[in-house]
Amino acid sequence: IFLEKNPNGIVVWGGPNFPPDFPSQLNYFKKFPLDIYVPIEGEIGFSNIVERGLKVSSNSELRKIILNSTIPGCISRLNNGEIKTEFSENRIKNLDEIPSPYTTGLLDEFFDGKLSPMIQTNRGCPFSCTFCVDGSDSVNQINQFTTKRVSDELHYISNKVKSNTHSLLISDLNFGMYPKDMEICDTIQEIQNKKN
């Protein structure tokens, strides 16, 4: 439907649920109508797509320019039909380099009482569970946001959230496994005691 309404649009998917081997990736591209897949963490690959898109002067040129060559951190279906990968370091080691979507105000409009806020305190998983896509070697290094960053987000959220919101989602793969997680729990408890 998207391409019917916008034939020059680019279909971009991303996330961890992508085959690790190239033959399976080719089959994935045959099965689904996508142009670009951004594996693992998305900030670098998606930023590279946006940077290339900003160089396009008209919507009619979008597909031609963006899909003309590979994009660092992405797997792309090029204009000639080839599936190509340009590898880059898609994992950000210092997660605090990523601006907070909360403290920058980007998520303020979603504090409407309909949604629950979600935070992430670390990325990666040290385990290699065969049933889990996150058990791969590419994400077994744990990278963490600093406790200060998480605390700042929690306090910001507590000042913005509506009184009918009773949940906070933590999207870590293994929250509670690291000593700093207790500090985060203490901050949550402190905020609850103050706000309730």
Summary of predicted features, one role per range:
Residues 88-95:
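A short, sequence-level motif marking secondary-structure junctions
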Residues 1-88:
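Glycine-rich beta-alpha loop elements in corrinoid/cobalamin-binding modules
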Residues 56, 60, 65, 92, ...:
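Low-complexity, intrinsically disordered regions enriched in charged/polar residues
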Residues 36, 92, 144:
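Short aromatic/basic micro-patch
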Residues 67-69, 91, 112, 163:
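A generic structural signal for short, non-catalytic loop/turn and secondary-structure boundary residues
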Residues 96-196:
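Radical SAM [4Fe-4S] cluster-binding motif and immediate context
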Residues 25-26, 53, 92, 101, ...:
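Amphipathic, positively biased hydrophobic alpha-helical segments used for protein targeting
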